[in-house]
């Protein structure tokens, strides 16, 4: 698959190789044991501090001992998020980003680059406080719930995902399927972004063929991955 991943359109490859997976909602003791072998880093950009409780509750399905790096935009938010982390007994840190340019992606790739590149973690869980205030409220809530539920639905759900990483060293990333309820993404999810994305890919020396209409992508920029797969 590693060669195919470099030469095939991503959505064609996922379809033809049957790489869409319905995650079981129960897990055996062996599955939990395999999941526990993975050192898990969670990175959460919490721009909306009032969502800190919701995010910590979602992350509570991760194996005990995970480490959280939360990023936010100011010191007031930082103190509020720290207080929530203390209530949940979560080990970690809260960083104030130098700029909100790039939003959660900039905070992840720039402000958290040191932990991502440290080699200390087997798995990184990336989420953020998603409100999509520019969209219809109900559609935005469905989008957020779609992402949270597909990645962090329950302890058994997460254990099955982590066990897959443990069993398959070539597995690089798990992501939610295309969100489409309330959004016109089916059949034309690139919108106006295809040409700019191709220009950036050319600058970076990425030669993987692009999907024509619906890119296989982490819509909402939330996923579970190996840090090495991001470089």
Language model features: what each stretch is:
Residues 1-231:
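ER/Golgi luminal nucleotide-sugar-dependent glycosyltransferases, focusing on the catalytic module
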């Amino acid at each position: 698959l590693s060669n195919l991943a470099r030469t095939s359109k991503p959505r064609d490859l996922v379809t033809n190789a049957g790489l869409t997976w319905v995650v079981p909602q129960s897990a055996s003791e062996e599955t939990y044991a395999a999941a526990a072998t993975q050192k898990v880093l969670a990175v959460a950009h919490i721009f909306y501090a009032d969502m800190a409780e919701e995010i910590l509750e979602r992350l509570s399905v991760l194996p005990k001992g995970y480490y959280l790096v939360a990023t936010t935009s100011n010191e007031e938010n930082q103190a509020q998020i720290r207080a929530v982390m203390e209530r949940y007994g979560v080990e970690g840190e809260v960083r104030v980003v130098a700029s909100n340019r790039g939003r959660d992606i900039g905070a992840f790739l720039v402000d958290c680059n040191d932990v991502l590149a440290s080699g200390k973690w087997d798995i990184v869980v990336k989420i953020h406080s998603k409100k999509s205030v520019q969209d219809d409220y109900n559609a935005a809530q469905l989008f957020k719930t779609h992402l949270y539920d597909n990645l962090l639905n329950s302890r058994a759900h997460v254990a099955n995902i982590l066990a897959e990483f443990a069993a398959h060293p070539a597995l690089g990333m798990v992501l939610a399927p295309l969100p489409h309820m309330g959004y016109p993404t089916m059949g034309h999810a690139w919108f106006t972004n295809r040409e700019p994305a191709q220009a950036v890919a050319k600058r970076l020396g990425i030669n993987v063929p692009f999907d024509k209409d619906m890119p296989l992508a982490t819509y909402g920029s939330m996923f579970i991955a190996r840090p090495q797969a991001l470089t």
